[in-house]
């Protein structure tokens, strides 16, 4: 039975049967926490890595001691958006310069550039635009083994040792059993060559190290080197072909390649993965020992020969510092297993070392050295502190290389396991903090080079830290990252959900990731390890499918960057599921048996069924006895992302349609009249709160003042918090941001309460659409192919109206001929055109504008012309303006209109930061209310999308028995083949809930079932099948069959017909081919392509075809003459030669081919380059009526040439195109989409 639950300010009837153990974590913590880590630790790590910087003599040392970020940014967030500034704070670093010769120490605080700050909502404001840094999903550093079969079916093992940065090592086996190695992607050579180069010189030493093995013998046979020196030389030849090899250079190269922390870095995660993979204990457990294993320190026997090694013993053997174990195989063969010599420090030190903060395993030989050298506790601690970089090395060690080679040999005996690179245990997340850290590192390493050079050049005495440090490389690297990295994206701000999803997005693309073209099917596919970590539903359709994913609802990211999912612990002693929550990574969870969240439990937490459906090793789903269970899911919605969790009855939808539903919710435009869904899932409130679209109380207190613009809350300590609300601001996506208070004066407020609604929220819940009364029936064919028939009432009552705000800007620059001027005094413009401009020449707020209207009057100086004596005299007498100007005003573009809601003016005089060469900048904001109309796209939450085909008058719409007309009619045929049955259940439950006055929460995988819905329908007084009799609005007669009617939540998507409809008569042409440009943005024409030409050819419509290919396209002379003929009412003349044909001839001539055009009588046709001055069309004069209604004389060709010249003078021409008649005759075809029934 449904039970009431209070979510925020609204009570919903919940059908949930599972009690919520834990709240959803903060949904944007992946952004906020990562950036916080970067400021606290990430920056420190980079400075520690880079310092000290020494000069080439080792005399001067520069250290970065400490750093601080100023608390006070120059502008606040809103001001940054207005001024196109970056929301940032200055980074100051304390730098110490030590001169070893003189012992002099200089300290200075150095400014290291402005560092972008993250807003509370997890975004950055860069140059006035809100951006999001998307987290990247990359392959984790580590050692990976893969298996293939050759033609004969023989097992071939290949492996890769991947660092965070540095040279790769790749091992592979060929069909002759030779194991070879590639160093840093060079040509392969036997693996023994690498071992010799690393100091294990003779064959006997190598066999002694790795043990007897036929593969080793085959490899040694192929290896032509016999000593350490030969090995080094051989490696050097492959790494540096063509250079003369010497033993010294080879040795230093190999050292630099692998053992220099500056060149080779595993990072924390790489060391962790190496130790996990190469550790002895996982490889020898459950195997049989070939000899007695004795503790070297105490002499006790761990395991006798022939005994099985348990997991606990294996761990003890490893931690005792034993690194080599011989195992006995089934055929009595001995196999040697070599670990990488890392142990748990606590097994060797009996006093408390928690203050050293060592969580990882440590290198045993180094630890042994320390323990042998010191006996006092404090001394040992100090030694550990000073040698921490050797104990936990960030680069690869010889031990690691030997262990990885040993693993390669062992795998043939099934010791160790093959890795799956798509498993989330082997893929990690690089969040904002780490991505930024990498950029800063790049910047600092460039800076290091500059500092070293300056140290040698500058005078020793006068040198200061300030003079050495050049901050340009660092700030350039950061700027480049935020401005142009693939992972720094313009935030999708269509609605709160799209904003939240964007911040939780995981992308496998980007620098260091995959590319679309190379990504195969396996990488994109859903993997069993995605469960509870990445959503299997929400991913884009198209080329990025599976490469861009969304984080699971409850997922967190651990210190190594692996995604963790929460589970409830199952207590095996009491056989109950506890409320103790453990976060597990993908490879940890594989060791356990996990039950699903909707497995029925008794009141005291015991399983109802004794056999439980569980996920076991490698994601297999089995029925297991309850005693085998280790963990249980925490919530059914942990599997999916936030957007998917907002689809009610998700479990009844086909996955393909659910994917579309999740993606289309992100495209819903915020409505003027918002309404929360009647059928929700209960996560709406949390999504809105964490997205940052609503205003949340920072502290508890009492509301003292509540107006449309601000809320003031008096805190318990007597201070006041002021919240300024945003009114009619433009979002990144051109939708309207408007915040309205939802509390009253005198209300008691608790910290964390939502106190004001934002766009597309209602009482703090995400409200993307409207609850509409829907019937599934056909109506006169207007439902064909998913089309939607809507009631005119939705238009009249503004139920689906949205406000869109567009921004236009105009800048007055300095030109070569003088500065441009913003003014009301525009040449050749009538009073009617400037009636809405103020005395500065800028449109007033509140004016209604249409396309072509002037927003900002601006004039640009024109080139000085030679004046006649008379004109000079007149100018001298009347003091006329000495220079000619032309009108370059900002006009409303084609097809746009609306009301001016805001105008912002920035000038040099007021001290505003403007880009070079700009004296004044004006921004106008035009708001347009768009009602729903034919051609707009709408959708439900189940992937059921369609286009509006007709708006039917209210009286013609079918109506229910009580006289209520329907809002929307949908096609019932759209359901069976698409299998999104969730929409039908939503409609039925919606009908009952609306009648009973409920708001419902039906969570995913834990919501209402069909019997709950039938009971609710019955309670509301409807038949149990939810079908009702409808009556035809035109005749009043009832329809033959009963029809499914109910309430569905319907969204209006941002694919609006107004933004897509476009028509052109004349307009801009492309510069080279002289063909009309394409696309609405360029005010282009419709392309008449190859196939359309075939259609006309098939009809034999020769004249139309000729016109389309010449005078309507790129026959420059012909199109002017045609214009002339139309204006004068004469016959249209013969077409000339198209410009693109001339271009083709030029292309052929550029290949030294002499091309002539001949008639059928072999007479050569002269292809003219351009219009000559004395051509007849040059004499065509045309009366042009200007804006003032006066008749001017005008020569078309000159006008065209002038226009072209002016265009060429503009400094910032982006796409060079010639504007022709468009400037003279402004013609427009008015398309009213209501005339077309689609």
Swiss-Prot record:
Q: Which UniProt keywords apply?
A: DNA-directed RNA polymerase, Nucleotidyltransferase, Transcription, Transferase
Q: Name one Pfam family in it.
A: RNA_pol_Rpb2_6
Q: Name the GO cellular-component terms.
A: DNA-directed RNA polymerase complex
- Alphabetized InterPro entries for the sequence: DNA-dir_RNA_pol_bsu_ext_1_sf, DNA-dir_RNA_pol_bsu_external_1, DNA-dir_RNA_pol_su2, DNA-dir_RNAP_su2_dom, DNA-dir_RNAP_su2_hyb_sf, RNA_pol_bsu_bac, RNA_pol_bsu_CS, RNA_pol_bsu_protrusion
Protein's UniProt keywords contain DNA damage? no
Q: Which superkingdom heads the taxonomic lineage of this protein's source?
A: Bacteria
Q: Which reaction does it catalyse?
A: RNA(n) + a ribonucleoside 5'-triphosphate = RNA(n+1) + diphosphate
This entry's Enzyme Commission designation comes to: 2.7.7.6
- NCBIfam families, from UniProt? PRK00405.1 (NF001616), rpoB (TIGR02013)
Q: Which HAMAP family match?
A: RNApol_bact_RpoB (MF_01321)
PANTHER family documented for this protein: DNA-DIRECTED RNA POLYMERASE I SUBUNIT 2
Reported function: DNA-dependent RNA polymerase catalyzes the transcription of DNA into RNA using the four ribonucleoside triphosphates as substrates.
Q: Which family does it belong to?
A: Belongs to the RNA polymerase beta chain family.
Complexes and interactors: The RNAP catalytic core consists of 2 alpha, 1 beta, 1 beta' and 1 omega subunit. When a sigma factor is associated with the core the holoenzyme is formed, which can initiate transcription.
Q: What is this protein called?
A: DNA-directed RNA polymerase subunit beta
What organism does the UniProt record list as the source? Clostridioides difficile (strain 630) (Peptoclostridium difficile)
């Amino acid at each position: 039975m449904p039970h009431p639950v209070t979510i925020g300010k609204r009570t919903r009837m919940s059908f949930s049967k599972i009690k919520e153990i834990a709240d959803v974590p903060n949904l944007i913590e992946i952004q906020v926490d990562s950036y916080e880590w970067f400021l606290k630790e990430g920056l420190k790590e980079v400075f520690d890595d880079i310092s000290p910087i020494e000069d080439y003599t080792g005399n001067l040392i520069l250290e970065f001691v400490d750093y601080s970020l100023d608390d006070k940014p120059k502008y606040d967030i809103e001001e940054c958006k207005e001024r196109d500034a970056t929301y940032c704070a200055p980074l100051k670093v304390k730098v110490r310069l030590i001169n070893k010769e003189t012992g002099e120490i200089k300290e200075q605080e150095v400014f290291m550039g402005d560092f972008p700050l993250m807003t509370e909502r997890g975004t950055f404001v860069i140059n006035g635009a809100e951006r999001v840094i998307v987290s990247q999903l990359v392959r984790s550093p580590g050692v990976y083994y893969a298996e293939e079969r050759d033609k004969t079916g023989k097992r071939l093992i290949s492996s890769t040792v991947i660092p965070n940065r540095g040279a790769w090592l790749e091992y592979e086996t060929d069909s002759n059993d030779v194991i070879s190695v590639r160093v840093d992607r060079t040509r392969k050579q036997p693996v023994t060559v690498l071992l010799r180069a690393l100091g294990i010189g003779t064959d006997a030493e190598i066999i002694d190290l790795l043990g007897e093995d036929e593969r080793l013998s085959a490899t040694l046979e192929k290896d032509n080197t016999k000593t350490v020196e030969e090995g080094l030389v051989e490696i050097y030849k492959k790494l540096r072909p063509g250079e003369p090899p010497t033993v010294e250079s080879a040795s230093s190269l190999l050292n630099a390649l692998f053992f220099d922390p500056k060149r080779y870095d595993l990072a924390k995660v790489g060391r962790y993965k190496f130790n996990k993979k190469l550790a002895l204990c996982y490889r020898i457990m459950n195997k049989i020992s070939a000899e007695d294993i004795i503790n070297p320190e105490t002499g006790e026997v761990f395991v006798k020969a022939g005994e099985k090694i348990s997991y606990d013993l294996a761990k003890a053997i490893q931690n005792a510092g034993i690194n080599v174990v011989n195992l006995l195989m089934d055929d009595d063969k001995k196999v040697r297993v070599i670990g990488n010599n890392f142990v748990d420090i606590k097994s060797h030190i009996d006093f408390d070392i928690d203050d050293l903060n060592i969580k990882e395993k440590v290198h045993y030989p180094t630890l042994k050295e320390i323990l042998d050298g010191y006996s006092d506790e404090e001394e040992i601690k100090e030694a550990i502190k000073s040698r921490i970089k050797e104990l936990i090395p960030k680069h690869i060690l010889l031990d690691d290389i030997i262990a990885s080679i040993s693993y390669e040999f062992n795998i043939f005996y099934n010791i160790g396991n093959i890795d799956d690179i798509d498993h989330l245990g082997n893929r990690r997340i690089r969040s904002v903090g780490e991505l930024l850290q990498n950029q800063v590192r790049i910047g600092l390493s460039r800076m290091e080079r500059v500092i070293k050079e300056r140290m040698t050049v500058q005078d020793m005495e006068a040198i200061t830290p300030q003079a050495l440090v050049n901050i340009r490389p660092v700030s350039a690297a950061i700027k480049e990252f935020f401005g142009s990295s693939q992972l720094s994206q313009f935030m999708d701000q269509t609605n709160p959900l799209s904003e939240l999803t964007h911040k939780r997005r995981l992308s496998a693309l980007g620098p260091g990731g995959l590319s679309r073209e190379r990504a195969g099917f396996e990488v994109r596919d859903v993997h069993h390890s995605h469960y509870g970590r990445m959503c299997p539903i929400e991913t884009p359709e198209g080329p990025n499918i599976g490469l861009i994913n969304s984080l699971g609802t409850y997922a967190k990211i651990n210190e190594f960057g692996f995604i963790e999912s929460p589970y409830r612990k199952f207590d095996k002693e009491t056989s109950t599921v506890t409320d103790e929550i453990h976060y597990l990574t993908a490879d940890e969870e594989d060791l356990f048996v996990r039950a699903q969240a909707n497995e029925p439990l008794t009141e005291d937490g015991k399983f109802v069924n004794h056999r439980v459906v569980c996920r076991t090793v490698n994601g297999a789903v089995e029925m297991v006895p309850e005693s085998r269970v280790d963990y249980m899911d925490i919530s059914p919605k942990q599997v999916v992302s936030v957007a998917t969790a907002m689809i009610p009855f998700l479990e009844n939808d086909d996955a393909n349609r659910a994917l579309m539903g999740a993606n289309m919710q992100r495209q819903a435009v915020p409505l003027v009249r918002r309404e929360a869904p009647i059928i929700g899932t209960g996560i709406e409130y949390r999504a809105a709160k964490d997205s940052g679209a609503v205003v949340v109380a920072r502290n508890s207190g009492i509301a003292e003042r509540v107006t449309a613009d601000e809320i003031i809350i008096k805190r318990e300590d007597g201070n006041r918090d002021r919240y300024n609300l945003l009114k009619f601001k433009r979002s990144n996506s051109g939708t309207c941001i408007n915040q309205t208070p939802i509390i009253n004066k005198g209300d008691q407020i608790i910290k964390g309460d939502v106190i004001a609604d934002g766009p597309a929220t209602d009482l703090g819940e995400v409200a993307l659409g409207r609850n509409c009364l829907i019937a599934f029936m056909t109506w006169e064919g207007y439902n064909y192919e998913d089309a939607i028939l809507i009631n005119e009432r939705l238009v009249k009552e503004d139920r689906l109206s949205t406000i869109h705000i567009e921004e236009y800007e105009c800048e007055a620059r300095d030109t070569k001929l003088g500065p441009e001027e913003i003014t009301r005094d525009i040449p050749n413009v009538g009073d009617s055109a400037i009636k809405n401009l103020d005395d500065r020449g800028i449109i007033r707020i509140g004016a209604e504008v249409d396309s072509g209207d002037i927003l900002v009057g601006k004039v640009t100086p024109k080139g000085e012309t030679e004046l006649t004596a008379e004109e000079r005299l007149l100018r001298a007498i009347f003091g006329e303006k000495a220079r000619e100007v032309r009108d370059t005003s900002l006009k409303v573009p084609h097809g746009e209109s609306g009301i001016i809601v805001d105008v912002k003016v920035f000038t040099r005089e007021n001290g505003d930061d403007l880009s070079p060469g700009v004296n004044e900048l004006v921004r106008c904001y035009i708001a347009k209310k768009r009602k729903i109309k034919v051609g707009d796209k709408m959708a439900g939450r189940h992937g059921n999308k369609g286009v509006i085909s007709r708006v039917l008058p209210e009286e013609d719409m079918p109506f229910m028995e009580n006289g209520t007309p329907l809002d929307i009619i949908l096609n019932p045929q759209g359901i069976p083949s698409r299998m999104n049955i969730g929409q039908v259940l939503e409609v039925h439950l919606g009908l009952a809930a609306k009648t009973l006055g409920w708001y419902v929460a039906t969570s995913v995988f834990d919501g209402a079932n069909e019997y709950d819905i039938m009971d609710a329908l019955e309670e509301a007084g409807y038949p149990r099948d939810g079908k009702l009799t409808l009556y035809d609005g035109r005749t009043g007669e009832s329809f033959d069959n009963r029809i499914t009617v109910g309430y569905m939540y319907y969204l209006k998507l941002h694919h609006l017909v107004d933004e897509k409809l476009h028509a052109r008569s004349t307009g801009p042409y492309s510069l080279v081919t002289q063909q009309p440009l394409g696309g609405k943005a360029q005010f282009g024409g419709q392309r008449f392509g190859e196939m359309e030409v075939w259609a006309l050819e098939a009809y034999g419509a020769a004249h139309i075809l000729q016109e389309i290919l010449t005078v309507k396209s790129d026959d420059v002379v012909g199109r002017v003459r045609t214009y002339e003929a139309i204006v004068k009412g004469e016959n249209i003349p013969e077409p000339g030669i198209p410009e693109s044909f001339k271009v083709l001839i030029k292309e052929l001539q550029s290949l030294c081919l002499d091309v002539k055009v001949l008639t059928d009588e072999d007479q050569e046709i002269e292809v003219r380059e351009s219009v000559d001055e004395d051509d007849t069309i040059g004499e065509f004069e045309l009366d042009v009526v200007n804006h003032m209604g006066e008749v001017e004389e005008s020569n078309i060709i000159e006008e065209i040439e002038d226009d072209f010249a002016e265009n060429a003078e503009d400094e910032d021409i982006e796409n060079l195109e010639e504007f022709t008649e468009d400037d003279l005759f402004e013609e427009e075809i008015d398309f009213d989409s209501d005339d077309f029934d689609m």
